[in-house]
């Protein structure tokens, strides 16, 4: 629900080059956040506070995932229920991210 437009992901690229900058700019046309493989994350928001909030939320989600990835999946939210949740809160979401 926090990232209804998703998060862009780039594979490892040589840092400090035009190619990683151009690839990031292309992803930013579609996403507010781009994860750079083996580097870090790039984000954009309306304010610096919003941007840091987005990045910190991704970091926390990644921590939770890494701590629980080895556990059996229980009580996951079904895609149909996720649609109900985002519609309840009026969040625009990408239908192509769900298996409906």
Question: What do these predicted ranges mean?
Answer:
Residues 1-100:
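Glycine-rich flexible loops
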């Amino acid at each position: 629900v926090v990232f209804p437009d998703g998060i862009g992901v780039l594979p490892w690229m040589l840092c400090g080059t035009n190619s990683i900058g151009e690839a990031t700019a292309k992803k930013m046309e579609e996403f507010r956040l781009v994860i750079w493989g083996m580097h870090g994350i790039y984000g954009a928001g309306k304010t610096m506070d919003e941007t840091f909030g987005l990045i910190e939320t991704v970091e926390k989600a990644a921590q939770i995932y890494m701590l629980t990835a080895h556990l059996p999946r229980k009580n996951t939210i079904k895609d149909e229920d996720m649609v109900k949740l985002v519609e309840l809160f009026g969040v625009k979401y990408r239908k192509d991210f769900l298996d409906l």
